[in-house]
Amino acid sequence: AKKKKKKSIKKIKKKKVSKKKKSIKKTKKKKVSKKKKSIKKTKKKKASKKKKSIKKTKKKKASKKKKSIKNTKKKKTEKQSSGGKIFKVSTAWSKNALIDKKGYEKKYNESVKNNEAFWSEEGKRIDWIKPYSKIKDITYSKEKVDIKWFYDGTLNVSYNCIDRHLPHKANDTAIIFEGDEPSVDSKITYQELKDEVCKLANGLKEIGVKKGDRVTIYMPMVPQAVYSMLACARIGAVHSVVFGGFSADSLAGRIIDCKSEFVITADQGVRGAKAIPLKNTTDEALQKCPDVKKCVVLKHTGADIAMKDERDVWYHDITSNASTDCEPEEMNAEDPLFILYTSGSTGKPKVCF
């Protein structure tokens, strides 16, 4: 009985010790697990905060950098445009301005509230051969977009640019020309402009240019380029100006696309110390343009160039003895004035008509 009692006490003690050990082990495990979780959470929070802080710092830095770049550009522009100074408009100058801010806002509001009446009045600012009675006809639909302005009126752009100024401004400067060289410059009066434009207009008519014909202008930056545009407008021909730096292929493409039968160019252009072979480029382009009837050539530098019989004519030959009077052609307000092509840097050049 004693032995049994001892064994029973021993077992109970063992069980108690085992339970105690297990309980201690569990408690330790729980504590360690909680500690680990707490450390993990703390680390996560710290990492998240750090990330957010880095992100914010980067954003702030990027924003500051952008602002700094913008401000630097602004300052550079201001310096370039005004030599480092900002010139405020004087009160005397503001008083003589054609329109002030209030006047502009008033006009704008009128144009929105009563659009047709507003443009009816604005249209009177230019001279009409036959005054308009209809202001606009606009259609917006999936099938058709059609926009017409002053479409029953007739006028001439060349007349509006030159002749209407002659009664009071004949001897005033119409064009200030600055050549490639600082010493090459001139001031052209309205009367001189009218005479030169009319002489060229008559010369163009003499070689067969008529109302509706397309004329390509491939010229250097000289007054004759302006005379050419205005002469075309005077006789109702549609002009297409092509930049004098374009290649023969680019020139040919534009001549063909606008169905031009006449070209006005020069022997050469000048850019700095470099001579631009305009006539040579034109000759190369015209090999692909069999429909071109005449090519008018301005003797600008006096360079030795080839002249093709029956097709090429000198600018001075068709203008020197021509009359300084040329009646402006009556044109409908919706008739085309000029064709201009985009550079074609993103594909085929687009047409502005």
Predicted regions: what they are:
Residues 8-12, 17-18, 23-28, 32-33, ...:
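Periodic short-repeat tracts
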Residues 82-106:
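Short, contiguous pre-domain boundary segments
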Residues 109, 158, 175-229, 247-252, ...:
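Conserved AMP-binding/adenylate-forming core of the ANL superfamily
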Residues 112-133, 152-176, 334:
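A short N-terminal helical cap/helix-turn-helix that marks the beginning
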Residues 161-188, 302-306:
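AMP-dependent adenylate-forming
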Residues 171-173, 295-297, 308-341, 348:
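Conserved pre-ATP/AMP-binding loop-to-beta segment of ANL
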Residues 215, 232, 336, 342-345:
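Conserved S/T- and glycine-rich ATP-binding loop of Class I adenylate-forming
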Residues 234-317:
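Structural core segment of the AMP-binding/adenylate-forming
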